[in-house]
Amino acid sequence: MEKVPMTAGGYQTLDEELKRLKTIERPAVIAAISEARQHGDLSENAEYHAAKERQGWIEGRIAEIEDKIARAQVIDVSKLSGKQVKFGATVSVVDEDTEEESRYQIVGDHEADVKEGRISLSSPLSRAMIGKEVGEVVEVYTPGGVKAYEILKVEWV
């Protein structure tokens, strides 16, 4: 089984969702199915079919989260240090064309949210920055062409 890097925060978020699904969502949908069964003919019972569909989604999500947790290699970013960019680093960069500065934390695939400043370890920008240090320029190949970014700062927060 291949281990997947994940921040401690990402692991906690998944664990909380798993607990919510198992303790709140699953019992609620079971109760909804039971109640819908009491309404008679199941073949034309929209409430029953909706609840069964919801149950399928919940069970699928539980299995997906359990798999991610089982494969997780949890990395406590607060215990990392160094000058090189690696998983968990928060990196400040400047676009060499537009002079626009951005700040991103490199996280696991399921944790990525660009609006929140978290980019996936497998993203083109992350792959270009891994192993680099402050002052180095990285090139990222995008559908719109090549973009160059200078690394301004590497932090461990």
UniProtKB/Swiss-Prot annotation:
Listed GO MF terms: DNA binding; RNA polymerase binding
Protein name (database record): Transcription elongation factor GreA
Keyword list, A-Z: DNA-binding, Transcription, Transcription regulation
PROSITE patterns: GREAB_1
Function text: Necessary for efficient RNA polymerase transcription elongation past template-encoded arresting sites. The arresting sites in DNA have the property of trapping a certain fraction of elongating RNA polymerases that pass through, resulting in locked ternary complexes. Cleavage of the nascent transcript by cleavage factors such as GreA or GreB allows the resumption of elongation from the new 3'terminus. GreA releases sequences of 2 to 3 nucleotides.
Gene: greA
Coiled coil spans: none
Family, per entry: Belongs to the GreA/GreB family.
Superkingdom in the source lineage: Bacteria
Example GO biological process: regulation of DNA-templated transcription elongation
HAMAP family tied to this protein: GreA_GreB
Gene3D superfamilies registered for this protein in UniProt: Transcription elongation factor, GreA/GreB, C-terminal domain, Transcription elongation factor, GreA/GreB, N-terminal domain
InterPro entries: GreA/GreB_C_sf, TF_GreA/GreB_CS, Tscrpt_elong_fac_GreA, Tscrpt_elong_fac_GreA/B, Tscrpt_elong_fac_GreA/B_C, Tscrpt_elong_fac_GreA/B_fam, Tscrpt_elong_fac_GreA/B_N, Tscrpt_elong_fac_GreA/B_N_sf
Source organism of this protein record: Caulobacter sp. (strain K31)
